[in-house]
Amino acid sequence: MGYLGEFEQLILLALARLGDEAYGVTIRDTLEERAGRRPSFGAVYSTLRRLEQKGLVRSFLGEPEAVRGGKAKKFVVLTPRGRSALRESHAAIVRMAEGVAGLRR
């Protein structure tokens, strides 16, 4: 599995947390609530495209909103490969942090 950058890891964690409710707005809101970050939608969407090209996420269109001219939301889910990459990345961080003074609460 290839290397995951920090923002890619945060996006994948947001997807894991949101499950079937993950789309641009909910992903960004989760990043703000849980990680204290408010990235631009451009940063979120470009990262999602890159993760999809790597086979770590899959996107699909939901039903259009029930209002005139309502758009369909583009939902995103983790693939098994994405879940595995996230697990490996997290394990590497835990191993690196093990025994480093001042990192545990």
Segments predicted by a language model, with ranges:
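Short secondary-structure boundary/capping segments
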Residues: 3, 49, 66-68
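Beta-hairpin "wing" of winged helix-turn-helix
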Residues: 54-69, 77
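Exposed loop/turn and edge beta-strand positions of beta-sandwich/beta-sheet ligand-binding modules
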Residues: 72
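Amphipathic alpha-helical dimerization/coiled-coil segments
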Residues: 81-105
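Basic amphipathic alpha-helical segments that dock to polyanions
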Residues: 44-51
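N-terminal helix-turn-helix DNA-binding core of bacterial DNA-binding proteins
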Residues: 2-43
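Alpha-helical residues within the helix-turn-helix
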Residues: 29, 52-53
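Short aromatic/hydrophobic contact patches that present stacked aromatics
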Residues: 12, 75-77
